[in-house]
């Protein structure tokens, strides 16, 4: 069974060299076609192995897709022009394999309902108390806070109109999935997906959210437990995945991708044993050679334990899991903290602050390292080295196969 699974998801016989069934496998090798796993996600996305990799780095996206998984590019940080360049690069480097994009269109945001909100108009709303608190914090660590000039018409962070423009750019490329987080996708997004025959996925952190997404017409649910990096809820993946699957089953058959803390093929197999159709992953790719993260942050990831990945409002204004640092302690624990501002105002503060922190750390400011942080899940405790994205995909496949073999052995006659 182990060799058969490995062959189906890797197309390689060599991985099974230690199996007791090796002789039989050799006899069957001739004429055997490479097969994909039996998962609705594989069928919907045209992939070999239902491992989805969210990343802001185009190199990771392309490498994962080439290796048989499915790369998903985080598009929210881009303008339409920069996204066009990124997608063109992916098209040229993905070897014809499928990939997707992810956007953020929050339902609950402090500027909801307001028109023509720009980055500069939001800057004017940031209280002086919060500006001074940030500047004083960085000064304690010999970091000069520098600001980035923005255009008068630059949209606010997490702007819905901009997100839809990004989708229009994306549909000029052969994307196979669009995903949204922080709420039900706008009706226009779902309609665009149907028009282009591209599945729409939505991230959820609670059963109630999943029911709303199913009613709205999404094609795939990414059920994300609290272990996940970035914005997340309070229910664990182990509880949330079966809870959602049970709740939506009488309504409509919507494939579920498990997310939150999944760093290994064994964890992926466990989630699929609960009924998930595959896995959505993020943090594991931050420790790859292709990742956009700095060498300093990778070193901090390797040194971290799972308890160092905490939920904090200090970066975006919403609870988001990230690596604990002097920054998170200052906003969440310090008695003189003014408290995080609501989304998107806190992002106005944190963007320039973290740009300044990262520059100082890269320039050799040893004290600045204490403030270096990024979004990462509790699975960070499982990271012990930096590897290539392709090697990580291969490890997922091998560990998945071993986990399935282990379970089969438990019930073997």
Predicted regions and their residues:
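Active-site entrance/lid segments in N-terminal catalytic domains of soluble metabolic enzymes
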Residues: 34-251
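Conserved active-site-proximal phosphate/metal-binding subdomains
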Residues: 116-132, 234-257, 263-413
């Amino acid at each position: 069974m182990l060799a058969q699974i490995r062959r189906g998801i890797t197309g390689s016989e060599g991985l099974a060299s230690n199996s007791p069934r090796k002789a039989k496998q050799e006899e069957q090798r001739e004429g055997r076609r490479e097969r994909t796993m039996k998962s609705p996600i594989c069928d919907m996305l045209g992939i070999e192995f239902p491992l989805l990799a969210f990343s802001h780095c185009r190199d990771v996206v392309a490498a994962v897709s080439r290796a048989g998984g499915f790369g998903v590019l985080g598009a929210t940080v881009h303008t339409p022009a920069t996204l066009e360049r990124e997608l063109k690069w992916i098209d040229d480097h993905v070897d014809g394999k499928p990939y997707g994009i992810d956007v953020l269109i929050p339902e609950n945001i402090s500027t909801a309902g307001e028109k023509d909100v720009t980055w500069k108009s939001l800057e004017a709303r940031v209280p002086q108390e919060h500006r001074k608190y940030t500047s004083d914090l960085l000064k304690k660590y010999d970091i000069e806070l520098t600001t980035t000039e923005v255009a008068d018409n630059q949209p606010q962070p997490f702007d819905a109109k901009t997100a839809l423009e990004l989708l229009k750019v994306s549909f000029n490329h052969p994307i196979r999935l669009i995903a949204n987080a922080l709420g039900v996708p706008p009706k226009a997004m779902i309609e665009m997906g149907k028009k282009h025959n591209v599945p729409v996925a939505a991230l959820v952190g609670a059963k109630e959210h999943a029911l709303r997404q199913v009613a709205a017409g999404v094609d795939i649910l990414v059920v994300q437990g609290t272990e996940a990096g970035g914005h997340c809820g309070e229910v664990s993946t182990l509880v949330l995945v079966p809870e959602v699957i049970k709740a939506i089953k009488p309504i409509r058959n919507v494939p579920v991708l498990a997310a939150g803390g999944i760093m290994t093929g064994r964890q992926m197999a466990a989630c699929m044993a609960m009924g998930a159709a595959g896995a959505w992953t993020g943090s594991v790719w931050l420790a790859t050679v292709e990742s956009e993260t700095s060498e300093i942050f990778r070193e901090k990831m390797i040194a971290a334990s799972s308890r160092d990945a905490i939920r904090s409002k200090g970066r975006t204004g919403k609870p988001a899991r990230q690596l604990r640092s002097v920054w998170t302690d200052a906003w969440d624990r310090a008695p003189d903290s003014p408290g995080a501002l609501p989304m998107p105002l806190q992002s106005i503060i944190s963007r320039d602050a973290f740009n300044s922190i990262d520059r100082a750390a890269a320039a050799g400011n040893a004290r600045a390292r204490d403030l270096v942080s990024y979004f990462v899940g509790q699975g960070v405790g499982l990271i012990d080295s930096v590897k290539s994205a392709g090697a990580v995909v291969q490890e997922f496949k091998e560990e998945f196969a071993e986990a399935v073999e282990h379970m089969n052995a438990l019930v073997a006659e």
